Structures are given as C-alpha cells and as structure tokens.
C-alpha cells in the first residue's frame, strides 16, 4: 500500500546531516504500522512526506501503486486522512456535526449517506452527545476525537495519526485506540501512527524504529518490547508487564522467555499459584 525507497530529506541546505537519511520501508494494505523514536528522529517528517506536505530531496514514495509527484499529489492526498497532535488547525465547522460533515459535503455525497457517516464516525469516537457543541468549547482530548471522526467519515484508504491520541487521558486513549482498530478491521483501512504510547504500539501489527533519521529496526510489538532496557534509548518506556515479568523471573516465580502481555502474565501467575 505504501512503499518508501531510499528517502532523504533535510529542512534546509545548511543542515549538516539529513533529517531522514536513506529511509526505506513498506506498509501492507490493511496493516497498522507504528513509527517510534526519540523527538527529532524523523517520525513526523516521514508522515508529512507521505502526505505530500513536504517534498523529499531524493528517493521515492509510492502509494497504492502510484508514485508521489507534483502531478499525482492531489490524487494521493485523496486516499490519505491525517490527524495531527494539535487538532485546532483542522476545524472549519460551526458545530462538531458540521465539522465532521464538511469533507463529505465537498465530495458531494447524498444527504442521507452523509448523515449516516457523520453519526457513525461520532459514535465510533464517543462524541455523539457533543454533536451540537462548538469545537472551540471542547477540551483538548475531545477536539482530537472530533478531528479523527472527521477523517473517519471520509473513509480514506490510509489513516495517518501523528501523536493524535497524546492529549487524551489513559482511559480515553485506550478507548480511542480500540475504536481505530475496529475501524481498520471494518473498512480494511491502512493505519500509520506516529506515537510514544505503548498501548498504541501494542495494537499495531509492526513497529518501525527511527533513530537519528535512519531505520533502526522493524519488528512486531512483542519483539520490540522484548528488548527491555533498550527501549529507553529508543524513546519509549518499558511496559509495566515487562518490568514485572523480569522481577518475577528473577525471583523464580515464573519461567518464560521474551515479552509477556498483561494477559499472558496473569495466566503464568495463575499457573504458578495452582501448583502451590
């Protein structure tokens, strides 16, 4: 669905090094790929290049079999929905409902289908009760939900989330991440998320680590979390279940290799307790 080949980019020619230096990777159709790394590693730059908001110095970006060029940028943007960390710049409607409907009106969708999509999108993100509210009167987390709803209603082939859940509380973030996964499954949407959130990473199929503008690794979330203390050097926290698993292993209470999810850890503990 997305193929990146030998991408190089710097914001100005005075930079001594590239922001992205010979980056190559691909995203499969219907896949959820998370991109992680320290601030300044090139994560958001990658998202903006794919969305045609920046122009690479060299390399290729291919979206759905079509190379991104000046001639194709608008066709490719039509396939991509992007949600950024600060959603205020994305609001255009007087009410939440109007804002979510804005893109659909521009596409000329029939009224009944437009109403159906708006209601479905707002329900997905838990904002139906706020449909008549002015976006400016919402909290930061609520604004992010509405911004995501506006993109979901358009049903793009690709959803790019650039720290889009960062302003939500932990419970709200988990609910929204699950909603995005439900949407991905329902519509076969490809998801690319720029994130530091471990729950978001855990939901993805694969994780790409950027380090100083280069691809450090591409792996499954389980393989990444198994790296333990290395995660801190990559700009991530160590999952609670990984810390607890290591402590229990050190005390001889469980016997396992690699990373355990919280569910797997509970199962290991039940197995241990049943033998006491």
From Swiss-Prot:
CC annotations in GO: ATP-binding cassette (ABC) transporter complex
Tell me the residue numbers annotated for binding ATP: 37-44
InterPro entries attached to this UniProt entry = AAA+_ATPase, ABC_transporter-like_ATP-bd, ABC_transporter-like_CS, ABC_transpr_CbiO/EcfA_su, ECF_ABC_transporter_ATP-bd, EcfA_1, P-loop_NTPase
Q: Which SMART domains is this protein grouped with?
A: AAA
Compartment(s) where it occurs, according to its Swiss-Prot or TrEMBL record = Cell membrane
Pfam families recorded for this chain? ABC_tran
Give all cystine bridges in this chain: none
Using the UniProt record, give the first listed, main subcellular location.
membrane
**Which CDD domains does the entry link to?**
ABC_cobalt_CbiO_domain1
> What does the record give as EC number?
7.-.-.-
- Which Gene Ontology molecular-function terms are recorded? ATP binding; ATP hydrolysis activity; ATPase-coupled transmembrane transporter activity
**Source domain of life:** Bacteria
Q: How does it sit in the membrane?
A: Peripheral membrane protein
Q: What class of enzyme is it?
A: translocase
Coiled-coil ranges per UniProt: none
Listed A to Z, the keywords are: ATP-binding, Cell membrane, Membrane, Nucleotide-binding, Translocase, Transport
State how it assembles.
Forms a stable energy-coupling factor (ECF) transporter complex composed of 2 membrane-embedded substrate-binding proteins (S component), 2 ATP-binding proteins (A component) and 2 transmembrane proteins (T component).
The free-text function statement in the UniProt record for this protein reads: ATP-binding (A) component of a common energy-coupling factor (ECF) ABC-transporter complex. Unlike classic ABC transporters this ECF transporter provides the energy necessary to transport a number of different substrates.
The Swiss-Prot or TrEMBL record describes its family as follows:
Belongs to the ABC transporter superfamily. Energy-coupling factor EcfA family.
Q: Write the protein's name.
A: Energy-coupling factor transporter ATP-binding protein EcfA1
According to its UniProt entry, this protein's organism is Streptococcus thermophilus (strain ATCC BAA-491 / LMD-9)
High-level lineage: Bacteria, Bacillati, Bacillota, Bacilli, Lactobacillales
């Amino acid at each position: 669905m997305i193929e990146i080949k030998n991408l190089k980019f710097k914001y100005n020619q005075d930079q001594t090094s590239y922001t992205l230096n010979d980056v190559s990777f691909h995203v499969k159709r219907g896949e959820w790929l998370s991109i992680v790394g320290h601030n300044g590693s090139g994560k958001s730059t990658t998202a903006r290049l794919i969305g045609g908001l920046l122009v690479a110095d060299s390399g290729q970006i291919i979206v759905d079999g079509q190379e991104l060029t000046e001639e194709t940028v608008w066709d490719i943007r039509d396939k991509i929905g992007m949600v950024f960390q600060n959603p205020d710049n994305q609001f255009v409607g007087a009410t939440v409902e109007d804002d979510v409907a804005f893109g659909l009106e521009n596409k000329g969708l029939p009224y009944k289908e437009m109403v159906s999509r708006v209601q479905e999108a707002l329900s997905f993100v838990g904002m139906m009760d706020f449909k008549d509210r002015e976006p400016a009167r919402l909290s930061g987390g609520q604004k992010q939900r509405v911004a995501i709803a506006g993109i979901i209603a358009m049903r793009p082939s690709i959803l790019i989330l650039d720290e889009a859940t960062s302003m939500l509380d932990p419970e709200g973030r988990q609910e929204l991440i699950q909603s995005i996964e439900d949407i991905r499954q329902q519509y076969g949407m490809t998801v690319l998320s720029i994130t530091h959130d471990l729950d978001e990473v855990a939901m993805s199929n694969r994780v790409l680590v950027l380090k100083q503008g280069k691809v450090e690794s591409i792996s499954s979330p389980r393989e990444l979390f198994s790296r333990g203390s290395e995660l801190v050097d990559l700009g991530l926290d160590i999952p609670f279940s990984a810390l607890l698993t290591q402590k229990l292993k050190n005390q001889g209470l469980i016997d396992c290799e690699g990373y355990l999810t919280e569910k797997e850890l509970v199962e290991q503990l039940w197995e241990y307790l049943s033998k006491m």
